[in-house]
């Protein structure tokens, strides 16, 4: 029998009676040196500082018939190496059982006196994670840290993305006599050093609640700069079929209303808002900050001149090109021939030019007209006031 045991912070006293009994009955005990050091003298089993599944399986094969215990820090079901051993044990027909332990998230929750059921759980320990995307999507995010990613490095990434005011809590050496809890903003914690055994909780209390496509027009900061209206934005996002990890371009971004919605629809991707007018660029910065669209990157300059160095897009919204539509399409399709494209137009001439440009490049052009009317009070009555009709032209491969 092989027993896989979560040892929490490494304290023998924190183990259940069943887990302690399994360790004491075992002939072989595997685990990291830190965990083996926590075993009491009455555990007389042969102790081996091994934790890689292949090494453990090889040793078990060399010692047939012996019961074994394998110790893991934290809980066996929470980003643990236990699953990496349990699968081959079952495949080999070796009997195995699991005793869970107390995870670091439970220890931090207890130390803070707060429940953790609403926290998003993310591991940055030995695996890639995007803290900016996670904190854009979730109000409270718990990070396991380790290796190259520390609480300070994660907070630095948040600060660099404009989320330096997010609240942070770092738990060090949880469940031990050296336990410490530190508080601060992401910007403050980014410049500090922490114990190797640390976890991070980030709380973004200013997370925008707007998520469905088509944010109200009045929610954006605007001036005289033209803005794509709510209903058109919602339709454009539907046409672009945005995926969470997409790389997106918004050419002729104006106030940034489309860019912001694209950014929040693709929190694990990047949005490049291309705009040449200084007043509009300032509005994009303000709306980016207001909506915490931290994955929105402003590209100041005229398209297509500034497009050459951008990464290949998965989808592109073209709201204005100042006569350079064909050159913009060439840049887009040169980087990704299968990019999803949506062009907005008011003038019939622009509509015709868009259809011709897409068709000439082997794309099928589909045109949707959006005519929006909104009510306006007139004394005791309400009248419908029409906005200018908008054309959305999408281009897809035949």
Label the predicted regions.
Residues 264-271, 337:
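Conserved S-adenosyl-L-methionine
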Residues 255-267:
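Conserved SAM-binding loop of SAM-dependent methyltransferases across substrates and taxa
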Residues 338-346, 350:
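Conserved beta-strand signature within the Rossmann-like core of class I S-adenosyl-L-methionine
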Residues 1-102, 106, 268-271, 275-277, ...:
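Class I S-adenosyl-L-methionine
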Residues 276-313:
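S-adenosyl-L-methionine
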Residues 2-6, 50-51, 65-68, 140-224, ...:
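A contiguous loop/helix-start segment that scaffolds small-molecule binding in enzyme catalytic cores
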């Amino acid at each position: 029998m092989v027993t896989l045991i979560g040892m929490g912070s490494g304290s023998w006293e924190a183990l259940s009676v069943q887990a302690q009994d399994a360790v004491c009955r075992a002939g072989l005990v595997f685990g990291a040196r830190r965990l083996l050091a926590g075993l009491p003298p009455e555990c007389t089993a042969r102790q081996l500082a091994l934790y890689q599944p292949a090494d453990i399986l090889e040793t078990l094969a060399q010692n047939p018939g012996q019961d074994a215990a394998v110790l893991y820090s934290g809980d066996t079901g929470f980003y643990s190496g236990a699953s990496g051993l349990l699968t081959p044990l079952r495949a080999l027909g070796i009997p195995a059982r699991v005793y869970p332990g107390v995870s670091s998230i439970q220890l931090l929750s207890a130390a803070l006196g707060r429940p953790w059921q609403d926290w998003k759980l993310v591991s940055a320990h030995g695996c890639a994670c995007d803290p900016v995307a996670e904190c854009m999507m979730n109000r409270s995010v718990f990070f396991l840290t380790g290796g190259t990613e520390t609480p300070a490095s994660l907070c630095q990434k948040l600060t660099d993305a404009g989320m330096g005011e997010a609240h942070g809590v770092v738990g060090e050496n949880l469940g031990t006599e050296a336990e410490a809890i530190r508080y601060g903003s992401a910007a403050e914690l980014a410049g500090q050093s922490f114990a190797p055994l640390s976890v991070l909780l980030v709380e973004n209390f200013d997370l925008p609640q707007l998520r469905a496509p088509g944010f109200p027009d009045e929610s954006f900061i605007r001036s005289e700069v033209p803005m794509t209206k709510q209903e058109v934005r919602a339709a454009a996002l539907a046409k672009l079929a945005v995926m969470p990890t997409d790389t997106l371009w918004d050419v002729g971004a104006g106030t940034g209303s489309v860019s912001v919605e694209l950014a929040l629809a693709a929190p694990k991707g990047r949005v490049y808002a291309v705009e040449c007018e200084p007043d509009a660029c300032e509005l994009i910065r303000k709306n980016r900050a207001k909506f915490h669209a931290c994955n929105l990157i402003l590209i100041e300059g005229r398209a297509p001149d500034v497009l050459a160095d951008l990464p290949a897009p998965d989808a592109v919204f073209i709201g204005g090109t100042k006569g350079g539509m064909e050159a913009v399409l060439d840049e887009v399709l040169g980087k990704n021939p299968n990019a999803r494209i949506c062009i907005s137009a008011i003038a019939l001439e622009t509509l015709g030019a868009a259809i011709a440009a897409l068709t000439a490049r082997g794309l099928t052009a589909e045109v949707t007209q959006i005519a929006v009317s909104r009510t306006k009070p007139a004394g005791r009555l309400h009248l419908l006031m029409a906005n200018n009709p908008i054309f959305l032209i999408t281009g897809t491969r035949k």
